[in-house]
Amino acid sequence: MQGSIMCDISSVSSNKKDIINANTYLGIELGSTRIKGALINGQYQVIAEGSYKWENKLENGLWTYDLSDAWHGIQSVFSQISNQINKDYQLRLNNIGGIGISAMMHGYLAFDNRNKLLVPFRTWRNTNTHDAHRILSSELNLNIPERWSIAHLYQCALDEEEHVHNVAFFTTLSGYIHWKLTGKKVLGLSDASGMFPMDSNSLSWDENALNKIENLPEISNQPWNLKDILPTPLSAGEFAGRLTVDGASLLDPSGILNPGIPFVPPEGDAATGMVATNTLKPGTGNVSAGTSIFATVVLKSPLSKAHKELDIVMTPDGHLSAMSHANNFTTDLNAWVNLFAQFADAIRKPISMDLLYTSLFNSAVDNGTEYDAGGNINYCFSSGEFQAGLEEGRFVFARSPQAKLSLGNFMRAQLYGAFCPVTIGMNVLTKEEHVEIDSLLGHGGIFATPEVSQRIASAAFGVPVTTMPTASEGGSWGMAILASYIRRKNITLIDFLQNEVFAHVNSVTVFPRKDDVEGFQRYFEQFMRSLPIEHAAIATMP
């Protein structure tokens, strides 16, 4: 099982049989920078995949994506998969055993009773919802993060935006795509728990929270009831509709794909990360690192109280988990790597990006590199960061006169700085709530460089960090696995993953090193002390 599978001759016959018999499962995930798709066979191996780059943009002070670009990307991804099946197996991909859609969690997509989008898609990245976060968290005695969909809706009501009276339905990005493909207004448990608080017993919306919010004046004077405009939560493996005729045309304008294919509940990227890393059991957790970063730990028991640094969300099968989320991670890091690439081009010594990333990352753990990055500090904030108390962000690299500026120290400062914001919430979980974490599993592109990012992450969190062959391609594959779970009866999702999907998967574990852990702690303390630098940059740089 790997994220990028080149099928050998012996597997072609088996894969052909699976394609003909619709024993294949498709997962499509809309990430922050790429839309990716993975088609798996009956043995949970990827037999075709596709990807499409897209970018968020800042419009009228709010981060958004163009939904027409989302559909163009989805169609491109499916076309790549369909063409690969035709090329490799001389078959038309006209039927699939199950489909699942996943996407970035949270955000705000609101529609009127004619299914018209009322305002441009507002993503998880927006931090204009601080007042809503503060009021809702106080009213519910729960942490309602700025990213959550209910915070977006309530902020719109607080701001008296004209569209609020006309809301007939609101959802997340995965919920929207699923709705357009199937006609069903549903959402998987994990993605739902990033919209609005969930009841872990009923596996539905928290009725007490619904009643409290309904009684807030800004909501009580609306012509709608909150419960009526939310999607219906569904557990992993539940039937969530079929591909409609219109949906088939949206997904595959060529007309090859047949309607009627069953769908599983749409999910968020936290859920697909848990599935792709087999971290659904209490005491396990995963770190998903990309444009943003979040660490999710499945809880053995509820936390003692609400913490503003931690989201309480669900696994796709309904277990409570705690999430520390940071809005910023690789944007600044990628910009620095691109600068080195430009230098290589300037001296007419071009280098592949894979080799460049590997070389730069390895320098961060070279023998001559100081464990605390030698007095160099980096703030990777391209946007606001709740964990650090920032409503906006600026990129800042700073060093003391005594700092040793070497390539290794510079790169370690970059990597440490990227992990610092998420560590704020993780420290609350481990040091205040005393949650014991057995291990974390890393996934996302940054973990594609063998062991380096694991070593940095293990220094930040103080626990072993494991990666598997799917480390850099987890989301769409994880959603395809959830799609395949629709065929399984009388087996829990945890057992399905443990005993079938991951029964023979290799992994690499890096254990924390004392010098790294102590070095990161010194860096982290300086990072927190020097945050006024970031505030000054925000105040003085447009």
Label every PLM stretch briefly.
Residues 7, 12-20, 26-27, 93, ...:
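Active-site core segments that coordinate phosphate-bearing ligands/cofactors
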Residues 214-234:
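A conserved helix-loop-beta module that forms one wall/lid of the active-site cleft
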Residues 52-54, 123, 512:
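Active-site donor-binding loop signature of nucleotide-sugar glycosyltransferases
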Residues 54-64, 136, 189-192, 224-230, ...:
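Gly-rich Lys/Arg/Thr-decorated short loops/hinges at beta-loop-alpha junctions or inter-strand turns
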Residues 126:
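Carbohydrate-associated surface elements
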Residues 1-119, 134, 166, 227, ...:
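N-terminal glycine/serine-rich phosphate-binding loop of ATP-dependent small-molecule kinases
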Residues 85-123, 143-145, 178-199, 230-243:
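Short beta-strand-loop/turn "lid" adjacent to the catalytic site in phosphate-handling enzymes
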Residues 129:
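Gly/Ser-rich phosphate-binding catalytic loop and adjacent alpha/beta segment
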